[in-house]
């Protein structure tokens, strides 16, 4: 089953909004074209960076439809399908059309803080409910619970359609255990732009990126250099991103990346509550950092 190739850089696409709060579909079309023109390896739609919890069912369907129509099977499309209600996730998988989708990204259940056995059972039933390739997503800073290496490996070994994990725990030792003991064909992806070089250095095959929304060509080049063993030149590019990494998350994601895209003239600086744009002081820092990055 493990057929989808996730090597390289996938980009977790933002959702642009107009000043009136509606989805800015023309801006979204532009962003997807921008990613394609700059050589990304795959797209992630309706993830955390997309502000998916604030999108209506109709908006989610239209966003996926639009992205599929623009991409036209040139690169894989991964759609976020997760939640803390196992039956609701299964219902979604059983009732919606995923015919043009290459894989799903499914987050560890959040808020209700399941045990490791609960996490295992959650993904077991999801894996049994679909033939789609599944990318596990471990992000304890958001979910409130960490999926251990042991649970991740158990799922990877038990279900052929669980093909990868986006690891955003920040725990390099834990991620290393997964990489060392994973079954053949199972792919480990960095869920953190800043840690991507370190994780590729121990065997990760790429990254699901936020900064790639802004700099797909430059960040993608860094990832490819690292994967091809040119760590020296990859580190040079990584160093150029240092301040931008900080600004991405200083007031939360996607506030930082949306501020950057606004400075570049791609989108309105608009988020949906309870998320808000970065403060003016941070916005000014973003402007200066982008100017410095462009002149390097």
UniProtKB/Swiss-Prot annotation:
Active site, per annotation: 137, 166
Catalytic reactions on record: L-aspartate 4-semialdehyde + pyruvate = (2S,4S)-4-hydroxy-2,3,4,5-tetrahydrodipicolinate + H2O + H(+)
GO MF annotation terms: 4-hydroxy-tetrahydrodipicolinate synthase activity
Biological-process GO terms, alphabetical: diaminopimelate biosynthetic process; lysine biosynthetic process via diaminopimelate
InterPro entries reported for this sequence: Aldolase_TIM, DapA, DapA-like, Schiff_base-form_aldolases_AS
UniProt cross-references to Pfam families, sorted A to Z: DHDPS
This protein's name: 4-hydroxy-tetrahydrodipicolinate synthase
């Amino acid at each position: 089953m493990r057929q989808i190739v996730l090597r390289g850089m996938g980009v977790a696409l933002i959702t642009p909004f107009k000043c009136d709060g509606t989805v800015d579909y023309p801006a979204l079309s532009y962003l997807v074209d921008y990613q394609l023109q700059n050589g990304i390896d795959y797209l992630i739609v309706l993830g955390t960076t997309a502000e998916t919890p604030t999108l209506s069912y109709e908006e989610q369907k239209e966003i996926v439809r639009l992205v599929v129509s623009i991409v036209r099977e040139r690169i894989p499309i991964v759609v976020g399908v997760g939640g803390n209600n196992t039956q609701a996730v299964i219902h979604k998988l059983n009732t919606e059309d995923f015919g043009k989708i290459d894989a799903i990204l499914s987050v560890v259940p959040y808020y209700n803080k399941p045990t490791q056995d609960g996490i295992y059972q959650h993904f077991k039933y999801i894996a049994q409910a679909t033939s789609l390739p599944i990318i596990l997503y471990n992000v304890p800073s958001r979910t409130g619970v960490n999926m251990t290496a042991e649970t991740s490996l158990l799922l990877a070994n038990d279900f052929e359609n669980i093909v990868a994990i986006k690891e955003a725990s920040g725990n390099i030792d834990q991620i290393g255990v997964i990489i060392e003991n994973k079954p053949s064909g199972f792919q480990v992806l960095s869920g953190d732009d800043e840690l991507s070089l370190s994780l590729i250095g121990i065997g990760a095959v790429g990254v699901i990126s936020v900064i790639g929304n802004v700099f797909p060509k430059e960040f993608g080049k860094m990832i490819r250099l690292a994967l091809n063993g040119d760590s020296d030149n990859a580190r040079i590019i990584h160093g150029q991103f240092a301040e931008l990494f900080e600004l991405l998350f200083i007031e939360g994601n996607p506030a930082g990346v949306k501020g950057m895209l606004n400075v570049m003239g791609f989108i309105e600086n608009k988020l949906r509550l309870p998320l808000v744009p970065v403060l003016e002081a941070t916005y000014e820092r973003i402007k200066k950092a982008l100017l410095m990055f462009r002149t390097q």
